[in-house]
Curated annotation (Swiss-Prot):
Record-level GO cellular component terms: chromatin; cytoplasm; cytosol; glutamatergic synapse; mitochondrial inner membrane; nucleoplasm; nucleus; plasma membrane
Post-translational modification note: Activated through tyrosine phosphorylation by BMX. Tyrosine phosphorylated in response to IL6, IL11, CNTF, LIF, KITLG/SCF, CSF1, EGF, PDGF, IFN-alpha, LEP and OSM. Activated KIT promotes phosphorylation on tyrosine residues and subsequent translocation to the nucleus. Tyrosine phosphorylated in response to constitutively activated FGFR1, FGFR2, FGFR3 and FGFR4. Phosphorylated on serine upon DNA damage, probably by ATM or ATR. Serine phosphorylation is important for the formation of stable DNA-binding STAT3 homodimers and maximal transcriptional activity.
Residues recorded as bearing Phosphotyrosine in the entry: Y640, Y705
Entry protein name: Signal transducer and activator of transcription 3
Reported induction: Induced by methicillin-resistant S.aureus infection in the lung.
Location of this chain's protein in the cell: Cytoplasm; Nucleus
Similarity remark: Belongs to the transcription factor STAT family.
Location of N6-acetyllysine modifications: K49, K87, K601, K615, K631, K685, K707
Amino acid sequence: MAQWNQLQQLDTRYLEQLHQLYSDSFPMELRQFLAPWIESQDWAYAASKESHATLVFHNLLGEIDQQYSRFLQESNVLYQHNLRRIKQFLQSRYLEKPMEIARIVARCLWEESRLLQTAATAAQQGGQANHPTAAVVTEKQQMLEQHLQDVRKRVQDLEQKMKVVENLQDDFDFNYKTLKSQGDMQDLNGNNQSVTRQKMQQLEQMLTALDQMRRSIVSELAGLLSAMEYVQKTLTDEELADWKRRQQIACIGGPPNICLDRLENWITSLAESQLQTRQQIKKLEELQQKVSYKGDPIVQHRPMLEERIVELFRNLMKSAFVVERQPCMPMHPDRPLVIKTGVQFTTKVRLLVKFPELNYQLKIKVCIDKDSGDVAALRGSRKFNILGTNTKVMNMEESNNGSLSAEFKHLTLREQRCGNGGRANCDASLIVTEELHLITFETEVYHQGLKIDLETHSLPVVVISNICQMPNAWASILWYNMLTNNPKNVNFFTKPPIGTWDQVAEVLSWQFSSTTKRGLSIEQLTTLAEKLLGPGVNYSGCQITWAKFCKENMAGKGFSFWVWLDNIIDLVKKYILALWNEGYIMGFISKERERAILSTKPPGTFLLRFSESSKEGGVTFTWVEKDISGKTQIQSVEPYTKQQLNNMSFAEIIMGYKIMDATNILVSPLVYLYPDIPKEEAFGKYCRPESQEHPEADPGSAAPYLKTKFICVTPTTCSNTIDLPMSPRTLDSLMQFGNNGEGAEPSAGGQFESLTFDMDLTSECATSPM
């Protein structure tokens, strides 16, 4: 089967990763239209040899023409349009650089192959991988359903056989007592014993049949318990474990976890069958008490059967007690498992055995670090108390689906203060954002004469005392849940394991896709890989340490990779979300790549990218222009940070940005958003209409005010147009200029002044204070 066909059969979790591989550089439509031909070419060789790359590129254009002819015959107007547009784009972008398209296609094919290998590994492991394919999950669930149906049928069949045995035993008991009574009378009267012997033989035959029936039932019960054990192992060790792993992935931004209802139905069905079987085993005890004999199989095997069924039911109930929603502060729903002292957090537990008789019977108690208190003290970790409503009764009324659950909405943590300021050991090896703590939930179940202690734990949480610790705390949560499925390893960061770039890349993309509508493309991830690992061709399998990811400063920078990236994520969510969702922000792109794609474009073409030097997160635009001699120049403006974007939206900055030459003529250098989208088309809808910016003047006022608006201007000189400043701190002076009418001071490190002008909209000219 062709690679592309195999990819389309994967689960949606994998398809999400597949979508991230493709962008405008290599459209997915082209991959779809020419799948067999693309897979038959040696793109890796073409990426290293220009003559072969040129040949393959021209062959690609020929294949596009042939496919266009097919669509023409089919009268498929939409596909004709898309294919023509794709060809024009490829010619304009790669005609002079065929090796570039070869590298892109080679990397996409390699990533596709890696994706298939991951899916195949999940299939071989029987669904215990993070994201099994849809086919594996469906087949496994169907088999599980069949096994559960088989268990239920066998339980019902045994129920019928138990009735048959009971009737046979009653007949035997009646005949035996009757014969015994008659035998006593005959002994008194001295009558012939022949009739008695005949009836004794009949009783012996009945006893033999009864013994065979008992042995058959005991054997079937043993087989039934083995079948239950197999189904239970599948449910708890595979299905439930897989759900818990998916919950971990969902906590760090991965695909949303599936609901527990189906798993609850399966576990409830098995629990009901186990209780019914336990009653059948108890029935055997009653039968034994009425009739027993030498070699009775009930006497020999019933205690063992009773012990097995009770153990199975206990273990099932313990496994069925889960944390449905991990601890999370309501103000930070996208960052669960990070809790700030003194701030309320919520969590929810659920029992996946839906017995109505347990409604309002189970009282849940919450505590923290129950089993790790001594360990925590040894390693110098802080200790906490849980405040608020830390006990609650499970009920079925609070859940929409009637599940047996308890939601805690008003919990807070308070640190236990010690003499040295809270930490039990001043020589603690871990910083506070690497300390892991467990929140424990406990209850007791009394059901049908059984007492079962239930206990479950949250995933490890990080407790912070200041919100500025959130980025590093979240990095700890990412690293832990990315690399382990052990739910209780609180000593994880004493020796944090190493991750691979493939793992890190997936998690980084989730940080965007979970809070926006767009993850990271393969090109964006490659740029991030260069930031972390340095220049390279193939980053797959490259190892990344915890220190490299979060603690060590990047080369030539005074901050770590994660601090830089986390601030960019925050910038996207709070200030430029709509533009990011539209795909207008290229974001992560190297300066070499930026120059390469802009140098072939007409003057005025610009792109939007994130700053590589701003610790707090910044976004800038880079455009192409021609100098006096006609030479192509690539210019960038100093990045805009959150402080500046608080005063003016990025779309309005782009729409109003101007360059002022020595003669005070204002020119807009931004015309087309890369590759060729008119600026007004892309950003106009995100700017406020002038009627909203300038309400009508009061008719009763003596003289109406002139309408004004702020624009961002970079002053320059004719002799130095090729040296446009990298730092127009335009919005830093916005409020000052608006208040006193004076221009901004020259930027501290810039060669030129950066001004925000107040434009007179009536005369359409700049009112310069200079």
